[in-house]
Amino acid sequence: LYKIGPHTFELGLSYASGQNALSIIRSEMRSIVSQVDEVCQMGVLVGQDVHYLLKEEGHAIISIISDVGHHLPAHVTGLGKALLSGLTDDEVRQLYAGYRFFPYTPNSIMDLDTLIAALQDIRSAGIAYESEESTAEICCVAVPLAENGQVKAAISVTTPKFRYTDEKKQQITQLLLKKRQLIEESCRIQNCRLVF
């Protein structure tokens, strides 16, 4: 005879809370897409990779290598760098100890010191930028999503370089910063955990 214990109940509550958080995030991602007509994605950090969990697309055609269920090296994506910014420099050094950096494009980060310097800038600004680091002709803006001061996920907007004007970059930046605040506040008010 088996019975459900308190740990199973807690696991179920955690799953339900994560699903509610995903619903909040997806709603805000749809709002972002409706305003900028570009691809919006959400992901989490798993080891040295960003794993893509949600994706919303606009009407504009864009071909990108990431998709829901896929993963890419975090250090070459805006989404990944936003996630890595939640780690301390020492944690990043430990995570990338012995890592072999691969040049996906000529703009890819190729060493640990450059990555750490980029992450320090992201921590200061609260936003990450990627310009053709994982894919030629593709740019990305991303923000981390935190719970109790710890980065748990990130959302991004990806756009082809030819549409990535200074005005578009500024529009996306302001929108993502606003949506980050809305998502984090909504999750806090609704008691939704950023657990995925």
Across the structure, where does each feature detected by a protein language model lie?
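Short amphipathic alpha-helical interaction patches enriched in hydrophobic/aromatic residues
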Residues: 12-16, 103, 159, 163, ...
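Amphipathic, soluble alpha-helical interaction motifs
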Residues: 14, 35, 167, 182, ...
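Solvent-exposed, non-membrane alpha-helical residues enriched in polar/charged side chains
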Residues: 30, 93, 120, 181-184
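Short amphipathic alpha-helical signal-transduction/dimerization elements
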Residues: 80, 84, 88, 177-184, ...
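Extended hydrophobic
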Residues: 107-182
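Short, highly charged C-terminal tails/helix-capping segments
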Residues: 189-196
